């Protein structure tokens, strides 16, 4: 019996293809199958980042993995099961596979659901880190994220804005787009400094250096950093 293939969850970073790791590039070149989160692989952001760093990906077999953006737990469960079954089929055939994900696979990633199930089933899996969006945003703003004994909190803006504002230290609000009005109001109420980048490292990048500049709504790839004002 042939040995099953191995699955690599590969972070392609936040948007700038030059921020992809050497390991990510090598694995994409060497793999048999590339899984991409989306119905049409070539149209996904993850693929569009990767193809700039690894043009050879065009010659790979691409498999779209559809995972809907929904809070409906039944729909999510079904999509996860389908993704696991699809991925396992290629692993059983002995294919070494890469599953692309934006940023880092460990942070709010669609990949991690597949990873956990396949690992439990005994398949060989490996997570390959990528640069997370909040680190890229902090670097693009040309400033540090935390210093000394400051705490760092990463918060999904679509769920827990109010609870997050009560936490001490620097607050990162991910996926802020549709919740931006709520995030903006919460930052102003708490009298914090807020900055945001939309589409960091991608075409159409927009930088907002103060909370007053924030629109009431932005695109999906919008990330907000809120800090205590200097001198407080």
Language model features: what each stretch is:
Residues 41-43, 132-135, 202-204:
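Short gly/pro/ser/thr-enriched loop/turn and capping motifs at secondary-structure boundaries
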Residues 106-167, 215, 229-232:
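Class I SAM-dependent methyltransferase SAM-binding "motif I" and its flanking Rossmann-like core
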Residues 67-73, 160-162, 202-204:
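A short acidic, often aromatic-flanked loop/helix-cap motif at beta-alpha or helix-coil junctions
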Residues 36, 61-66, 127, 147, ...:
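Structural signal for conserved beta-strand scaffold positions within catalytic alpha/beta enzyme cores
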Residues 1-17, 22-24, 29-123, 209-215, ...:
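Class I S-adenosyl-L-methionine
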Residues 74-77, 110-111, 138-140, 164-166, ...:
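Short, well-ordered secondary-structure micro-motifs
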Residues 14-17, 40-41, 158-160, 175-179:
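Short beta->alpha connector loops
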Residues 7, 165-232:
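A contiguous loop/helix-start segment that scaffolds small-molecule binding in enzyme catalytic cores
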């Amino acid at each position: 019996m042939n040995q099953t293939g191995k699955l690599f969850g590969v972070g392609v970073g936040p948007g700038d293809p030059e921020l992809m790791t050497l390991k990510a590039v090598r694995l994409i070149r060497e793999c048999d199958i590339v899984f991409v989160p989306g119905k049409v692989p070539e149209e996904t952001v993850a693929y569009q980042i990767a193809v700039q760093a690894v043009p050879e990906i065009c010659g790979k077999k691409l498999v779209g993995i559809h995972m809907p953006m929904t809070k409906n737990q039944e729909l999510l469960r079904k999509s996860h099961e389908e993704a696991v079954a699809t991925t396992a089929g290629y692993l059983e055939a002995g294919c070494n596979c890469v599953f692309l994900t934006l940023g880092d696979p460990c942070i709010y990633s669609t990949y991690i659901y597949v990873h956990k199930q396949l690992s439990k089933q005994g398949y060989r899996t490996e997570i390959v880190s990528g640069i997370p969006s909040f680190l890229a945003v902090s670097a693009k703003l040309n400033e540090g994220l935390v210093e000394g004994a400051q705490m760092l909190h990463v918060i999904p803006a679509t769920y827990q804005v109010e609870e997050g504002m009560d936490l001490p230290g620097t607050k990162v609000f991910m996926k802020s787009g549709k919740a931006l009005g709520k995030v903006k109001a919460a930052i102003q109420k708490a009298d914090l400094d807020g900055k945001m980048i939309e589409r960091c490292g991608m075409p159409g990048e927009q930088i907002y250096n103060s909370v007053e500049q924030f629109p009431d709504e932005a695109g999906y790839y919008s990330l907000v950093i809120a800090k205590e004002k200097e001198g407080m």
